[in-house]
């Protein structure tokens, strides 16, 4: 199976590029953001708990996310692979994901890091918030999310470099140009 972690700060284009990867490679997309938004919309207990963290710009506790992902991953047993979008966000999550996949005879194939400067991220996220009405795309929450990303999530780059799975992708440019760079990285696996 082709198991990809797509990585980058909020607003780096993970969702957009994930859709293109899914279409080209015929793999399934697991977006923790979409899963969590569905839980919140449906008013589940997990959704209510998650909403409290999201509204404060904080990360969801690992044990909640790993359980959700294991269930979703297991529903794709006959798949060519999956792309993990929005997970892992910390080294303990990466280690938990590795264990969860190993228990299923799988591993991460590659981690794609969509690298975008912070000023551009702010511009993209403020625009997205205005267009979509997403509550977590206001300036104050965006700044908190970027601080969390830089302190808690960014160390994953070194983790995946150590695993030999890291691929840097320049997240500036056209969607097509960025996707070409992604395909070059994936096609060499």
UniProtKB/Swiss-Prot annotation:
InterPro entries, per the entry: Adenylat/UMP-CMP_kin (IPR000850), Adenylat_kinase_CS (IPR033690), P-loop_NTPase (IPR027417)
Record-listed ATP binding positions: 11-16, 128, 173
Annotated region (LID), positions in chain: 127-137
Pathway info: Purine metabolism; AMP biosynthesis via salvage pathway; AMP from ADP: step 1/1
Molecular-function annotations in GO: adenylate kinase activity; ATP binding
Region (NMP): 31-60
Record keywords, A-Z: ATP-binding, Cytoplasm, Kinase, Nucleotide biosynthesis, Nucleotide-binding, Transferase
Residues annotated as binding AMP: 32, 37, 58-60, 86-89, 93, 134, 145
Location of the protein in the cell: Cytoplasm
GO cellular component, one term: cytoplasm
The EC number(s) this enzyme carries: 2.7.4.3
Gene Ontology biological process terms in this record: AMP salvage
One Pfam family cited in the UniProt record for this chain: ADK
EC category: transferase
Catalytic activity annotation: AMP + ATP = 2 ADP
Main location: cytoplasm
Subunit details: Monomer.
PANTHER family per the UniProt record, alphabetical: NUCLEOTIDE KINASE
Function: Catalyzes the reversible transfer of the terminal phosphate group between ATP and AMP. Plays an important role in cellular energy homeostasis and in adenine nucleotide metabolism.
Family in the record: Belongs to the adenylate kinase family.
HAMAP family given in the database record: Adenylate_kinase_Adk
Free-text comment about domains: Consists of three domains, a large central CORE domain and two small peripheral domains, NMPbind and LID, which undergo movements during catalysis. The LID domain closes over the site of phosphoryl transfer upon ATP binding. Assembling and dissambling the active center during each catalytic cycle provides an effective means to prevent ATP hydrolysis.
Protein name (Swiss-Prot/TrEMBL): Adenylate kinase
């Amino acid at each position: 199976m082709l198991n990809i972690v797509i990585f980058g700060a909020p607003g780096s284009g993970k969702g957009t590029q994930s859709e293109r990867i899914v279409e080209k490679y015929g793999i399934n997309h697991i977006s923790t953001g979409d899963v969590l938004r569905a839980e919140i919309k449906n008013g589940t207990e997990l959704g209510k708990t998650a909403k409290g963290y999201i509204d404060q710009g904080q990360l969801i506790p690992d044990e909640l996310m790993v359980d959700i992902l294991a269930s979703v991953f297991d529903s794709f047993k006959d798949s060519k692979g999956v792309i993990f979008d929005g997970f892992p966000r910390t080294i303990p999550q990466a280690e938990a994901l590795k264990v969860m996949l190993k228990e299923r005879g799988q591993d991460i194939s590659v981690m794609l890091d969509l690298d975008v400067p912070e000023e551009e991220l702010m511009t993209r996220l403020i625009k997205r918030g205005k267009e979509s009405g997403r509550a977590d795309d206001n300036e104050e929450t965006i700044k908190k999310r970027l601080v969390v990303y830089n302190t808690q999530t960014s160390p994953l780059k070194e983790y995946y470099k150590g695993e030999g799975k890291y691929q840097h992708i320049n997240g500036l440019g056209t969607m097509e140009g960025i996707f070409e760079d992604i395909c070059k990285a994936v096609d060499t696996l």
